[in-house]
Amino acid sequence: MGCASSKEEVALTPLSDVNAAKEVADLKAQVDQLKRQLASAGQSAAPAAAGAVKGGVVETLFFPDEKLPCRNNRRPGGCKRQHCEYSHTPTSLSRFLDYLGSATRTLDICVFTITNDDISDVVLELHNKGVRVRIISDNDQAHTQGSDIDKFRQAGIAVRQDKTAAHMHHKFAIIDGRLLLNGSFNWTRQAVTANNENVTVLSDPKLIASFQQQFDKLWDMFK
């Protein structure tokens, strides 16, 4: 914000015994003015930054978490156990679940593999509330131990899988067409507590539109 150059412009000149007091007073006035300018610039920058967030990165979540979040603590009434081994404080997964659970109309999921029951439970709850959920996943991963794909199908959620020898390796979700969750994070327990992973939450309309276009393309391709 130009702080360095401003300080350089405030040059000290040799002071004589006669005008020392005046020079010091003038210098103090300049410093006070500079402080007021910096404060004013900071206040005016805040709305601009807020606007940038609305159209860009909302938050980036990093894994692994030290512990899985306590399911009971996320429910009304909280956890009643005296010695609970799960986390009662916000974690990357709990934040992820908050974003995922905020869907009110649509949830489009395009993820390589889904085996994490905490995530699957939120997806099923949204489906039961009437949110239109669509899932695209990898065909090979759907048959691995712990996969929740069959659980989703049995619940009536629309699921499609790739039909090629290559992997469907995306890891993103679109919430109500207003939020995008995207990153390296596979929806597995291993990814939560062991792997170095990331999920970026974005709200940029153009970026979301491009991911929605890709989702719709794959959805039609994997009929």
Curated annotation (Swiss-Prot):
Q: What are the recorded GO MF terms, alphabetically? A: endonuclease activity; metal ion binding
For this protein, what is the EC number? 3.1.-.-
Q: Where is the active site?
A: 169, 171, 176
The enzyme's first-digit EC class, named in words, is: hydrolase
- Keywords for this protein: Endonuclease, Hydrolase, Lipid degradation, Lipid metabolism, Meiosis, Membrane, Metal-binding, Mitochondrion, Mitochondrion outer membrane, Nuclease, Transmembrane, Transmembrane helix
The superkingdom listed in its UniProt entry is: Eukaryota
- What PROSITE patterns does the entry give? PLD
Report the protein name in the record: Mitochondrial cardiolipin hydrolase
